[in-house]
From Swiss-Prot:
Identification of the protein by name: Flagellar M-ring protein
Record-linked InterPro entries: AMP-bd_C_sf, Flag_M-ring_C, FlgMring_FliF, FliF_N_dom, YscJ/FliF
Topology of this chain in the membrane: Multi-pass membrane protein
Region Disordered, residue ranges: 312-365
Family: Belongs to the FliF family.
Recorded superkingdom: Bacteria
GO biological process, one term: bacterial-type flagellum-dependent cell motility
Residues that span the membrane, as ranges: 40-60, 463-483
Assembly and binders: The basal body constitutes a major portion of the flagellar organelle and consists of four rings (L,P,S, and M) mounted on a central rod. The M ring is integral to the inner membrane of the cell and may be connected to the flagellar rod via the S ring. The S (supramembrane ring) lies just distal to the M ring. The L and P rings lie in the outer membrane and the periplasmic space, respectively.
Length: 570
């Protein structure tokens, strides 16, 4: 199947478009050459220049704006803008940040105006909820109001931290009852909105946790959760002893390094000069905690701890005789005889005695118990590095001679000795001290901002630039246009005056009168004569006169017109 022929418009070469474009340009040129458009062109240019000048004035006269209150809620922004607009202050919403911005000169007046109206309101006061509590309120409603007031007060207190723009506190308080043996502990959740560009360190998060837990009875610190607007849990690991210990250890190490560095700088700066030293100190610390308990026993040395002694003695006579009345009667009175020996009865009458003794003694062997707790933070190694600015060396007279050292050996030895004394150098510990000399790169120190950084200087420069732009537009554009419109154009060199080059047709003049005037005039004719002719016959007469004066130019013009028409037809 033969392919369909390509349309002629597609096969038209690119060279065929050139005559069409030339024809369009000629049409535009002819449209611009119309007398009415030419007469209206100055007014159009003046209007365009005026519009551009007004636009530049509006853009350049816009003052520098500053943010009034960062981090305001949307409802607060609407109230703030309404209040400022009513007070005559041009407040707008910044397109980049979305914050309320006011002119720099009106900043303090805007804050005073908003403060007088109680804006921004922020969080309500918790006491207002309790003061509006009506009589006869149920216990559940009163408890809910009390919890809400407590949440608002805690949120207001947390918002006072400079890095926190807004805060919300949620309390989960279980109901207390005497009939419950075990109850759930109270818990709290804190949501923080951090100011852009700011962060909360661990100490600030710990302070918020302590603030909330101390404000609620029975709440433990581990029952408080802190979250920021990015969804990050800030209170994670705040109660972990290992985490707290690591933070304290790092802080202690940084403090020691700073102390040693300050010691070295205070000793070496008077020698090398301010800004000619760079000191860094690194300390390796051992935080291992050891408990050594030692017990010693000496068997040769004893000590009497307690002694107990018990002695029992009995002296009662023993019972004798036959039980009965006769045996219990007293014996008869005996007759005493001189010189008679003692009888057996006398011996039997002597009492019986018994004695027992018991003694107990407790001894303790000599013992020595010693408990040693070494220091928790022990410096294991100290490394100090000192860089001294090398002084410029004079030009060497002998190129073959070795260059002199950047730091003299005597001075280097003195600096090293002072550095070792400052850090408490211990070779057995493995301490290292390094001192070298190198040329420093000159850093550009920012100059202090003077009067040129003041806001009024920028405003004055903006106004001056605006006035200069208006002067350039007025003198370079508007003035030439007005001169061209209001003042007659000067005659060209070799041309006749206006009265001799233009044909003015008065009222009541006939064609013969105009023809007679043209014949009498022997000067050059211009296009203004054709524009001044009113009737068709007058225009033909002027064209004939032009043909008589310059036949070659007229023929060339007609030839170009015919060629353009032929190109358009093709």
């Amino acid at each position: 199947m033969a392919p369909s022929p390509t349309p002629p418009a597609v096969r038209r070469p690119a060279s065929a478009l050139i005559p069409q474009m030339r024809g369009m340009l000629d049409q535009i040129r002819r449209f611009g050459d119309q007398p009415g458009l030419r007469r209206a062109m100055p007014a159009i240019l003046i209007l365009a220049v005026t519009v551009l000048a007004l636009a530049g004035w509006i853009l350049l006269r816009e003052p520098a704006r500053v943010t009034l209150y960062p981090g305001l809620p949307e409802a607060e922004k609407a109230r703030v803008i309404d209040s400022l607009t009513g007070g005559g202050i041009a407040a707008v919403i910044d397109e980049r940040t979305g914050e309320v911005a006011v002119p720099g000169a009106e900043y303090h007046r805007a804050r005073m105006l908003l403060a007088a109206q109680g804006l921004p309101q922020g969080l309500p006061d918790g006491n207002a909820l309790l003061s509006d509590l009506p009589m006869g309120t149920s216990k559940s409603v009163e408890t809910a109001r009390l919890r809400q007031a407590q949440e608002l007060d805690l949120a207001r207190s947390i918002t006072e931290i400079s890095a926190v723009s807004a805060a919300r506190v949620h309390l989960a308080l279980p109901e207390r009852s005497a009939f419950l043996r075990e109850s759930q502990p109270p818990r709290a959740s804190v949501f923080l909105q951090i100011v852009p560009g700011r962060t909360l360190d661990g100490a600030q998060v710990e302070a918020i946790v302590n603030l909330v837990s101390s404000s609620v009875p029975g709440m433990a610190r581990q029952d408080v959760t802190v979250v920021d607007q990015m969804g990050r849990l800030l209170s994670r690991g705040s109660d972990d002893p290992a985490v707290l210990l690591n933070d304290r250890q790092l802080q202690h190490r940084v403090q020691l390094e700073t102390l040693y560095r300050n010691r070295i700088e205070s000793l070496l700066t008077p020698i090398a000069g301010p800004g000619n030293l760079a000191v860094q100190v690194t300390i390796d610390m051992d935080f291992t905690r050891q408990e050594i308990r030692e017990e010693q026993v000496d068997p040769d040395r004893t000590a009497l701890l307690a002694e107990q002694s018990q002695i029992e003695e009995t002296a009662d006579p023993q019972a004798r005789g036959i039980p009965g009345a006769v045996s219990n009667s007293p014996p008869p009175e005996a007759a005493l005889e001189a010189g008679a020996p003692p009888t057996a009865a006398g011996e039997a009458a002597a009492p019986m005695r018994s004695r027992s003794q018991n003694s107990t003694r407790n001894f303790e062997v000599s013992r020595k118990v010693e408990t040693t707790l070494p220091a928790t933070a022990r410096i294991a190694r100290v490394s100090a590095a000192v860089v001294v600015r090398a002084q410029p060396q004079p030009a060497a007279t002998d190129p073959a001679a070795p260059p002199p050292p950047l730091l003299p050996e005597a001075l280097k030895a003195d600096l090293e000795r002072l550095t070792r004394s400052a850090v408490g150098f211990d070779a057995d510990r493995g301490d290292v001290v390094t001192i070298t000399a190198q040329p420093f790169l000159d850093t550009v120190v920012p100059e202090a901002s003077g009067w040129s950084a003041e806001p009024w200087v920028a405003d004055l420069a903006r106004q001056g630039f605006l006035l200069a732009a208006l002067a350039v537009v007025a003198l370079g554009v508007v003035r030439p246009i007005l001169n061209r419109v209001l003042l007659p154009a000067p005659a060209a060199a070799g041309a006749l005056p206006l009265g001799e080059t233009a044909v003015e047709v008065g009222e009541g003049e006939s064609l013969d009168d105009v023809r007679a005037r043209l014949k009498a005039r022997q000067g050059a004719l211009t296009k203004n004569m054709l524009d001044a002719a009113r009737s068709h016959e007058e225009q033909i007469l002027v064209i004939r006169k032009l043909v008589e004066e310059d036949e070659g130019r007229i023929a060339t013009t007609i030839r170009q017109m015919i060629a353009a028409e032929l190109d358009t037809v093709k």
